[in-house]
Amino acid sequence: MKKVLFLAALLLVCFSGVTNAQTRKQREDAKREAWKKERQEKKALEAQQDSVSYVQAINALKNGSFVLEADNVVFRNGIMRFVSSNTNYVEVNDGQGIIQTAFTNFVYNWSPNGLGGVTVQGNVNGISMRQDKDGNVYYNYGINGIAVSATVSIVLTGGTNQASVTINPNFSGNTLTMNGY
């Protein structure tokens, strides 16, 4: 009789362990599926927001009224530096343009604008805009300021509002690329 009770108790313990392992696995699988679903929903929402931002960016380029704030700057020798978007930007509004650079976290201590960079303000001319099959938008224009004139090329990445601006001064080879939104 003791053997039968012992075997019954042993079977009961083994059975409860198997059941517990199965329910734990089911809980883990349910958590994993919920996480995957949440991640897919988040990606879908981000894609929708990016497409709305992309359309707004294209409309701003078409209207000739936009500001591109740079997060980083790439110099002609390939050195990249993160910069403040408050003081590094390209702006166009109703035929007037401003290009401002300020490298406060880099080597330049003195500059014409007092911020460690250059500010060009002037008239915008020669605007051209085209879009390729991938949705990338190419926007080019010239800017003529008091002391400096430059050619500006903007590439708006398809499906997002992320852009790259290449500034090519007409009287020097100091090309500068700014990346931002």
Place the predicted regions along the sequence by residue.
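Bacterial Sec-dependent N-terminal signal peptides
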Residues: M1-R27
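Sec-dependent signal peptide cleavage junction
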Residues: V18-A60
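Helix-rich interaction surfaces within compact, conserved domain-sized segments
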Residues: D29, N125-Y181
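N-terminal post-signal-peptidase region of extra-cytosolic proteins
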Residues: V52-S53, A70-S85
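Well-ordered beta-strand positions
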Residues: A60, E91, I98, V155-T157
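A short, Trp-centered hydrophobic/proline-enriched beta-strand micro-motif
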Residues: L61-V73
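Short beta-strands and strand-coil junctions in structured, solvent-facing domains, enriched
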Residues: F75-R76, F106, V148-T151
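Mid-length scaffold segments of soluble, non-membrane domains
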Residues: M80-D134
